[in-house]
């Protein structure tokens, strides 16, 4: 990827949620990270100061809204506000992982908020001119924003690693649930139309354990589970057990966003999973970094190239043309 020789019109700032990723993006772009103070007052309120001139600059702010979600979202909002008040030309909110994305509907008409829309409206209202994110939980979330959204996909990065690590001779792509079939089918197609399997979870009746039915032939295969995020890893680990029981020789998972909350690490360490490959949209905890089953890929090059294309008015969608 060509580096940006002239930084006068492009600046990259970072919140505290994932500074290592921002540093990697800046390295790929050949620019330095913008100078800012992002901290908290003694009572916990956000404190932000932009420490250099940004007047008429095209600014990108990198901040995933991962845990602690409310704090990281608020931090993003006040950084954007500080930049807008400093007379930037435009601000793009680069949100590698968009938290609250699973709260995108009212389930069974319960009296609950659609929090994904609340967060999107806040980001739009504060003055963001554009949003750049990776693998939204649901593509329709783009419509919650009142500004343009570039939802880019980590699949090229994951596919390249699958080709390198496992080849395509004896693999089968597996969707861990019916809702992920479209994603899994697309991955299978890009891997040379490899076989596809689906795990159908259902509870036969009340007070009876959930049964996992495997749709597809996994016996003797290396199973590649694909999904957009892993949280407690309960479903993922149960899927690995079901696949091994049905004759799979190896079970690996490729997942974009490593939320990894609650009992996730215990579940993974004690699971039948042979490997879990994730990206750095969310920083890993110390326990996750030390886990021998977890391997992390970087989305820095993907985000840097997308930022470059946005800054120079080039096509983003052409990144995904075969």
Swiss-Prot record:
Give the family, as the similarity comment puts it: Belongs to the ribose-phosphate pyrophosphokinase family. Class I subfamily.
Under which pathway is this protein filed? Metabolic intermediate biosynthesis; 5-phospho-alpha-D-ribose 1-diphosphate biosynthesis; 5-phospho-alpha-D-ribose 1-diphosphate from D-ribose 5-phosphate (route I): step 1/1
Q: Which GO terms describe its cellular component?
A: cytoplasm; ribose phosphate diphosphokinase complex
The UniProt annotation places Mg(2+) 2 binding at 177
Q: What class of enzyme is it?
A: transferase
Residues given in the record as D-ribose 5-phosphate binding sites: 203, 227, 231-235
Cofactor(s) this protein requires: Mg(2+)
Per the UniProt record, one Pfam family is Pribosyl_synth
Annotated active site residues, numbered on this chain, are 201
* Molecular function (Gene Ontology), one example: ATP binding
Instruction: Tell me the Gene3D superfamilies matching this sequence.
Output: 3.40.50.2020
Q: How does it assemble?
A: Homohexamer.
Keyword Secreted carried by entry: no
- List this protein's GO terms for biological process: 5-phosphoribose 1-diphosphate biosynthetic process; purine nucleotide biosynthetic process; ribonucleoside monophosphate biosynthetic process
Keywords in alphabetical order: ATP-binding, Cytoplasm, Kinase, Magnesium, Metal-binding, Nucleotide biosynthesis, Nucleotide-binding, Transferase
For this entry, the protein name equals: Ribose-phosphate pyrophosphokinase
Which EC number(s) are documented for this chain?
2.7.6.1
Q: Report the principal subcellular site.
A: cytoplasm
State the InterPro entries in the record.
PRib_PP_synth_CS, Pribosyltran_N, PRibTrfase_dom, PRTase-like, Rib-P_diPkinase, Rib-P_diPkinase_bac
Q: Which reaction does it catalyse?
A: D-ribose 5-phosphate + ATP = 5-phospho-alpha-D-ribose 1-diphosphate + AMP + H(+)
């Amino acid at each position: 990827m060509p580096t940006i020789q002239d930084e006068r019109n492009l600046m990259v700032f970072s919140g505290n949620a994932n500074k290592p990723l921002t540093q990697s993006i800046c390295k790929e772009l050949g620019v330095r990270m913008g100078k800012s103070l992002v901290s908290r007052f003694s009572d916990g309120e956000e404190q932000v100061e932009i420490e250099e001139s940004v007047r008429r600059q095209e600014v990108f702010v990198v901040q995933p809204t991962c845990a602690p979600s409310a704090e990281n979202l608020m931090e993003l909002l006040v950084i954007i506000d500080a930049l807008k008040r400093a007379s930037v030309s435009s601000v793009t909110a680069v949100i590698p992982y968009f938290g609250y994305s699973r709260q995108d509907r009212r389930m069974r008409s319960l009296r609950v908020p659609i929090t994904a829309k609340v967060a999107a409206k806040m980001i739009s209202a504060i003055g963001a001119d554009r949003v750049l994110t990776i693998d939204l939980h649901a593509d329709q979330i783009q419509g919650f924003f009142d500004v343009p959204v570039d939802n880019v996909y980590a699949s090229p990065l994951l596919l390249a690693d699958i080709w390198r690590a496992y080849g395509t001779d004896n693999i089968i792509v597996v969707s861990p649930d019916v809702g992920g079939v479209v994603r899994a089918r697309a991955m299978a197609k890009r891997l040379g139309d490899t076989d596809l399997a689906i795990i159908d979870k259902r509870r036969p009746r009340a007070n009876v354990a959930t049964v996992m039915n495997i749709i597809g032939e996994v016996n003797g295969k290396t199973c590649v589970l694909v999904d957009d995020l892993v949280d407690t890893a309960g479903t993922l680990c149960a899927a690995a057990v079901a696949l091994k029981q049905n004759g799979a020789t190896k079970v690996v998972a490729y997942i974009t966003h490593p939320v990894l909350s609650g009992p996730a690490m215990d579940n993974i360490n004690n699971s039948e999973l042979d490997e879990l490959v994730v990206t750095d949209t969310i920083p890993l905890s110390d326990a996750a970094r030390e886990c021998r089953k977890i391997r992390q890929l970087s989305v820095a090059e993907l985000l840097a190239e997308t930022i470059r294309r946005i800054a120079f008015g080039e096509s983003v969608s052409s990144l995904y043309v075969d």
